[in-house]
């Protein structure tokens, strides 16, 4: 075994895989430490990728040069476009994944990747010097691996405990090993830890459930994919359906009669669980007025014999879980392969991180994923990619990649984590992004592909394909502006017959697209440049034309905000010397130590008056470093 690496990544989940691949692809000698060789990028909870905001993150990962989108496309059982009846700012792609094939795909990518070693041992601690600079890790056999940077992506394995009713025992997900020594190292380094919780529902045997009364939830009959490079699509007739059922009054009564047996309500658990993915008993307590709740029955893999009971996670003891399951319609004879459980684990306070995802007070140590207080595979993968990129760039002496809130949902997430902190597992939502009309599902490439190319993760071939992609959009918009249709044209007749539009005079194709009721597919046969475009390209054209005024106004606002990002705050500033700064603002600014005025303005507890005082102080004390208003 080698003993010296550039980058060591601890944990082979979704964050760890992206971090390790990014580092290795940037020519860094990289080690990925994982407890099991066959458990890479597993899906211990929901067997799906994407969804509102999260699906856009997957496309952002792809645009930057990550792997998740390709894996999700290659192993999709069903593909669905969500929120299509609403505004384009909240459209989102979601795939039901074959979890076994997804993990196998990522294992193969890891094994084939140059510069990357997979080491199946436990990390028992961090090696660091007296200056709080991490220099490597300890393995379970007391071997030391040296590194220039270490990235911790331990997910829910960090000092984790499984909870079922009053039963509580040390374990990782699915009764796998847990990781304990790293927590002690973090505490010894002065890093503040928190305790969070999540949970997962039961897996039930397919042949024990009758879904004849369930509502079928099919995929979307469109050529949809996460990755820019995906060119093959699973036809709708070959996609696997999901099913929708509802809990019953009996289910509710079982919960109410046994609430004190739940780990959540018996006092066994004091840690905080995810607000947007609550246990079923949580739903019953929090929404007392509701007698029933939605439950989705989802396939996990074509190679298996189980259903995933989405929306039915619980920390009830097994005997109560059985009653709960058998109260569901079609589940009267259900047999269970894996029971539901809650899991409690250590994570850090992310306000201790810099925007690069390196710890502020510990050099060469990066963290990504659920250890940073987030939930979800996509959030983890996005952080892992950024951590892997920035660890590599630090070794090369380059500035970190820091995505702004107007550039990416990944930027929104990291900015929220480091400036606002978390008090419950953080989940990305479209409502967290103030510029969501700019952060759309269709335009991840045009937002971020340039970054991916400059970083070094986009190949020459993919870059050439992207340039063609952009040129095709530009050519189509040009042609739409030039071509005109009279009221007697075949297009006008078609639109009138389908009650999409009544062209009373001559219109350009561009003007026709502006009509909200018009489907761009009606124009395809009349405009040659539209015929070769992908779904995402067509969506981009419609949105850019139809929402032209809104997009322009949003970009003007962003231009003003970017100026605040350029106003740097010196690292040696003493906030106690800033006159008329509120006490809370001083405390928060000192703790977070923002890099610029834009970041400072987004910190909870720092108000506009505080920012004005800070600007005044900077102009006075650092006249050569501050930027003019």
UniProtKB/Swiss-Prot annotation:
Role this protein plays: NAD-binding protein involved in the addition of a carboxymethylaminomethyl (cmnm) group at the wobble position (U34) of certain tRNAs, forming tRNA-cmnm(5)s(2)U34.
What does the entry list under GO cellular component? cytosol
Q: Matching NCBIfam families, A to Z?
A: mnmG_gidA
Presence of keyword tRNA processing = yes
Q: What is its main location?
A: cytoplasm
State the Gene Ontology terms under molecular function: flavin adenine dinucleotide binding
Q: Name one Pfam family in it.
A: GIDA_C_1st
SUPFAM superfamilies (UniProt xref): FAD/NAD(P)-binding domain (SSF51905)
> What's the cofactor?
FAD
**Record-given protein name:** tRNA uridine 5-carboxymethylaminomethyl modification enzyme MnmG
* PANTHER family in the cross-refs: GLUCOSE INHIBITED DIVISION PROTEIN A, PROTEIN MTO1 HOMOLOG, MITOCHONDRIAL
Q: How does it assemble?
A: Homodimer. Heterotetramer of two MnmE and two MnmG subunits.
The entry assigns this protein to a family as follows: Belongs to the MnmG family.
Q: Where, subcellularly, is it found? A: Cytoplasm
Q: Which organism is it from?
A: Mycoplasma capricolum subsp. capricolum (strain California kid / ATCC 27343 / NCTC 10154)
Question: For binding NAD(+), which residues are annotated in this chain's numbering?
Answer: 273-287
The answer to whether keyword Flavoprotein applies is yes
Organism ancestry: Bacteria, Bacillati, Mycoplasmatota, Mollicutes, Mycoplasmataceae
| Residues where FAD binds | 11-16
Keywords associated with the record:
Cytoplasm, FAD, Flavoprotein, NAD, tRNA processing
Q: Which gene encodes it?
A: mnmG
Return one Gene Ontology term, BP aspect: tRNA wobble uridine modification
């Amino acid at each position: 075994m080698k003993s010296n690496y550039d980058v060591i990544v601890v944990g082979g989940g979704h964050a760890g895989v992206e971090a390790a691949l990014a580092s290795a692809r940037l020519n860094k000698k990289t080690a990925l430490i994982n407890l099991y060789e066959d458990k890479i990028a597993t899906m211990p909870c929901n067997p799906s990728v994407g969804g509102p905001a999260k699906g856009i993150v997957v496309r952002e990962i792809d645009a930057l040069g990550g792997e998740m989108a390709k894996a999700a496309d290659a192993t999709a059982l069903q593909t669905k476009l969500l929120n299509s009846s609403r505004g384009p700012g909240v459209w989102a792609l979601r795939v039901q994944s074959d979890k076994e094939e997804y993990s196998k795909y990522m294992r193969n990518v890891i094994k084939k990747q140059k510069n990357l070693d997979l080491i199946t041992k436990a990390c028992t601690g961090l090696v660091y010097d007296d200056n709080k600079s991490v220099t490597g890790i300890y393995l379970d056999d007391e071997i030391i691996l040296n590194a220039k940077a270490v990235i911790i992506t331990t997910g829910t394995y960090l000092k984790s405990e499984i909870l079922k009713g009053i039963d509580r025992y040390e374990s990782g997900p699915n009764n796998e090993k847990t990781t304990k020594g790293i927590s002690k190292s973090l505490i010894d380094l002065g890093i503040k830890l928190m305790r969070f919780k999540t949970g997962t529902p039961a897996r039930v045997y397919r042949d024990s459930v009758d879904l004849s009364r369930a509502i079928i939830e099919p995929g979307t009959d469109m050529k949809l994919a996460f990755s820019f490079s995906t060119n093959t699509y699973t036809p709708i007739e070959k996609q696997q359906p999901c099913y929708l059922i509802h809990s019953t009054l009996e289910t509710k009564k079982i919960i109410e009669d046994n609430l004190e047996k739940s780990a959540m309500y018996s006092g066994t658990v004091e840690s905080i669980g995810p607000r947007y993915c609550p246990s079923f008993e949580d739903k019953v307590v929090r929404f007392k007025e509701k007698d029933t709740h939605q439950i989705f029955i989802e396939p996990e893999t074509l190679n298996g014999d189980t259903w995933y009971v989405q929306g039915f996670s619980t920390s009830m003891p097994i005997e109560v879980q059985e009653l709960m399951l058998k109260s569901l319609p079609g589940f009267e004879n259900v047999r269970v392969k894996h029971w539901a459980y809650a899991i409690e684990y250590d994570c850090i306070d992310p306000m201790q991180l810099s925007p690069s995802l390196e710890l502020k007070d510990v050099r060469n140590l990066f963290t990504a994923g659920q250890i940073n207080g987030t939930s979800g595979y996509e959030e983890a993968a996005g952080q892992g990619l950024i951590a892997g990129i920035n660890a590599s760039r630090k070794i090369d002496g380059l500035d970190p990649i820091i995505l702004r809130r107007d550039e990416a949902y990944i930027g929104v997430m990291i900015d929220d984590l480091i400036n606002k902190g978390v008090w419950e597992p953080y989940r990305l939502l479209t409502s967290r992004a103030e510029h969501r009309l700019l952060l759309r599902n269709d335009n991840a490439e045009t937002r971020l592909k340039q970054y991916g190319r400059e970083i070094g993760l986009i190949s020459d071939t993919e870059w050439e394909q992207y340039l063609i992609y952009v040129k095709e959009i530009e050519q189509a918009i040009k042609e739409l502006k030039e071509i005109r249709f009279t009221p007697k044209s075949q297009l006008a007749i078609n639109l009138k017959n389908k009650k999409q539009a009544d062209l009373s005079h001559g219109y350009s194709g561009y003007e026709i697209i502006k009509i909200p009721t018009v489907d761009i597919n009606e124009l395809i046969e009349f405009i040659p440049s539209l015929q070769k475009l992908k779904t995402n390209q067509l969506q981009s054209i419609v949105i850019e034309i139809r929402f032209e005024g809104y997009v322009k106004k949003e970009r003007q606002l962003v231009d003003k905000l970017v100026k605040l990002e350029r106003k740097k705050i010196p690292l040696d500033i003493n906030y106690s010397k800033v006159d008329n700064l509120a006490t809370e603002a001083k405390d928060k600014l000192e703790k977070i130590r923002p890099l610029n005025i834009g970041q400072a303005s987004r910190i909870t507890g720092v108000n506009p008056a505080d920012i004005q005082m800070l600007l005044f102080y900077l102009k006075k004390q650092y006249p050569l470093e501050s930027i003019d208003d």
